[in-house]
């Protein structure tokens, strides 16, 4: 049986959660349960390990953090649902699951696509630009780091937020890439991070076959 711990962390500074993910990954062993961390961050730009400084177009009051995830620069802010996936990929392989880093990325993209389908929205991934898009606009960004055969970092789904800071950057390294969010397609009452988080978790668990969940921190996420 595959066990998964889901942590609902509220609004937390980016660097605190990033360092906690690093510590968790460094300290986990073959008996450590996989975890999902659900969180929102106060305004911050994060630069991926392959990030180029020219993709930060203008300076602002928003801090820039150089991080160890894959990819280029992106923006995080309140109203964006983050789902970090701390998954022991090598253990899943040992259990007979056909999974690679690329397939984990695909699973993340598909859980977003299925979440959008729940709202009657047609979203899709692009083979040459990880993430999920609606009519050419990006609604979800992805970035992972693999250490000791285990993943951390994850996805950022724009739900109901101020998209203006994206104008200070080339999002994910793509000049002119337009960003979008869920509230542009449904009523604002329904564009809530807690509702999106519940759907993301359910679809992710179904895709990867997690059949037992432990929910912590008074999460409103419902087990599947």
Swiss-Prot record:
Stretches assigned to the BPL/LPL catalytic domain:
30-212
Catalytically driven reaction(s): octanoyl-[ACP] + L-lysyl-[protein] = N(6)-octanoyl-L-lysyl-[protein] + holo-[ACP] + H(+)
In this chain, the site described as Lowers pKa of active site Cys is at 138
What UniProt keywords are attached to this protein's entry?
Answer: Acyltransferase, Cytoplasm, Transferase
Compartments it resides in = Cytoplasm
**Cellular component terms per the entry's GO annotation:** cytoplasm
Alphabetized Gene3D superfamilies for the sequence: Bira Bifunctional Protein, Domain 2 (3.30.930.10)
In terms of SUPFAM superfamilies, this protein maps to: Class II aaRS and biotin synthetases
Q: A GO biological process this protein is involved in?
A: protein modification process
Which pathway does the UniProt entry assign to this protein? Protein modification; protein lipoylation via endogenous pathway; protein N(6)-(lipoyl)lysine from octanoyl-[acyl-carrier-protein]: step 1/2
Q: What is its EC number?
A: 2.3.1.181
User: What superkingdom does the record give?
Assistant: Bacteria
InterPro entries reported for this sequence: aa-tRNA-synth_II/BPL/LPL, BPL_LPL_catalytic, Octanoyltransferase, Octanoyltransferase_CS
Entries under Pfam families matching the protein: LplA-B_cat (PF21948)
Q: Which residues does the annotation say bind substrate?
A: 69-76, 141-143, 154-156
Q: Where is the active site?
A: 172
Q: Name one GO molecular function term.
A: lipoyl(octanoyl) transferase activity
> Which family would the database say this protein is a member of?
Belongs to the LipB family.
- Which PANTHER family does the record match to this protein? LIPOYLTRANSFERASE 2, MITOCHONDRIAL-RELATED, OCTANOYLTRANSFERASE
Instruction: State the remark under miscellaneous.
Output: In the reaction, the free carboxyl group of octanoic acid is attached via an amide linkage to the epsilon-amino group of a specific lysine residue of lipoyl domains of lipoate-dependent enzymes.
Q: What role is this protein assigned?
A: Catalyzes the transfer of endogenously produced octanoic acid from octanoyl-acyl-carrier-protein onto the lipoyl domains of lipoate-dependent enzymes. Lipoyl-ACP can also act as a substrate although octanoyl-ACP is likely to be the physiological substrate.
Name assigned to this protein: Octanoyltransferase
Q: Which organism is it from?
A: Haemophilus ducreyi (strain 35000HP / ATCC 700724)
Q: Which gene encodes it?
A: lipB
């Amino acid at each position: 049986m595959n066990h998964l711990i889901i942590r609902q962390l509220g609004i937390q500074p980016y660097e605190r959660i990033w360092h906690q993910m690093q510590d968790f990954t460094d300290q986990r062993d073959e008996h450590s349960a996989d975890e999902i961390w659900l969180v929102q961050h106060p305004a911050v730009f994060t630069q991926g390990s392959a990030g180029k400084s020219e993709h930060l177009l203008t300076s602002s009051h928003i801090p820039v953090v150089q991080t160890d995830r894959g990819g280029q620069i992106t923006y995080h802010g309140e109203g964006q649902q983050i789902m970090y996936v701390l998954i022991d990929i090598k253990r899943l392989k040992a259990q007979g699951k056909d999974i690679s880093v690329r397939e984990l990325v695909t699973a993340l993209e598909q859980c977003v696509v299925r979440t959008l389908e729940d709202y009657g929205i047609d979203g899709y991934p692009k083979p040459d630009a990880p993430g999920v898009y609606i009519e050419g606009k990006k609604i979800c960004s992805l970035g992972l780091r693999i250490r000791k055969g285990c993943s951390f970092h994850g996805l950022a789904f724009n739900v109901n937020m101020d998209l203006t800071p994206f104008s200070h950057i080339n999002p994910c390294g793509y000049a002119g890439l337009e960003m979008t969010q869920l509230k542009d397609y449904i009523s604002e009452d329904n564009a809530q991070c807690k509702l999106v988080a519940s759907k993301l978790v359910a679809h992710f668990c179904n895709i990867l076959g997690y059949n037992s969940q432990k929910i912590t921190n008074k999460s409103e996420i419902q087990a599947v």
